[in-house]
């Protein structure tokens, strides 16, 4: 997707640090929304802070499609997934500046995670539309942005863009240090 600012690789290492799970525990955040066997999208996956726990949650019959713009981040994710014996549950995809490159998943995805990614793209509507198109009817999205650099009004504007793209907000979520919402097709 077009980018305003892309997360530097060195920040990816900080974001993947296991200490982060003390404050933003992926199982607590995502567990209520994931069931074994699901097909899940992790958009802007970076080095896999959420991807690996998602792979555990979907189990051997599920699949996590991990999408990022930066090959270095994806290479790190692949190494981490291999070490965790989860690579068989993860599909790693590099998107480009104009597309998430996920059209073949049209109507097949149960759940998508958009965590700290919208502020990095120029055209949020395009990203939300591609995610909506990939989701099955009733598919859900956890959408979150960091509170520090992203003011509340900017997050609310992004939720409005998501709603204009065909998603609807069904709930607010409480995620430490984040503005967050649960969206649905």
Q: Where on the chain are the PLM-derived regions?
A:
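A short acidic, Gly/Pro-enriched loop at the edge of an enzyme's catalytic core
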Residues: 38, 98-112
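Conserved alpha-helix/loop element of class I SAM-dependent methyltransferases that forms part
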Residues: 20-38
